[in-house]
Curated annotation (Swiss-Prot):
It comes from the Eukaryota. It is found in: Mitochondrion inner membrane. Its EC number is 7.1.1.2. The lineage of its organism: Eukaryota, Viridiplantae, Streptophyta, Embryophyta, Tracheophyta. SUPFAM superfamilies: Nqo5-like. It is a peripheral membrane protein. Complex I is composed of about 45 different subunits. This is a component of the iron-sulfur (IP) fragment of the enzyme. InterPro entries: NADH_DH_suC, NADH_quin_OxRdtase_su_C/D-like, NADH_UbQ_OxRdtase_30kDa_su, NADH_UbQ_OxRdtase_CS. One of its GO terms (molecular function) is NADH dehydrogenase (ubiquinone) activity. Keywords: Electron transport, Membrane, Mitochondrion, Mitochondrion inner membrane, NAD, Oxidoreductase, Respiratory chain, Translocase, Transport, Ubiquinone. Belongs to the complex I 30 kDa subunit family. This is NADH dehydrogenase [ubiquinone] iron-sulfur protein 3.
Amino acid sequence: MDNQFIFKYSWETLPKKWVKKMERSEHGNRFDTNTDYLFQLLCFMKLHTYTRVQVLIDICGVDYPSRKQRFEVVYNLLSIRYNSRIRVQTSADEVTRISSVVSLFPSAGWWEREVWDMFGVFSINHPDLRRILTDYGFEGHPLRKDFPLSGYVEVRYDDPEKRVVSEPIEMTQEFRYFDFASPWEQRSDG
């Protein structure tokens, strides 16, 4: 059984409202879904006989500030039985909440915390959704494209006081232009 069979079978079996877009490549299959059907789709991928996804490799976030739903959350899955990789993607904005998949894949707990900490995408029913990489009092989400390059506060060790101090940064941020074109491709200006 190969990626092509899994792709074709999934297309014929899955409810059409669960999948917005499907794409097949030599590296695996990609399914774009609405946040409302994310949990059901991942449950299908894990439990169905012809997909049998046992491993959630990781969850990543991507920020596209020009989109209405600016955040894309990507679930990379692996079916060991069928030697197949499956990528499930969903989009969210600042207020959209995504269903936690910790009950399906216990390892998702760490990655959902990371996506929350770095991007601010909230997972509903997560057992312990708190910051994982930044400090307790940290404000903002540092992998968002609108996060200031220098941050909001400077944290340093003050030798005379013998403690770590946080001070607000008082320099203004320069304008940032997001050019998504590859710097290695030649652009024609005209």
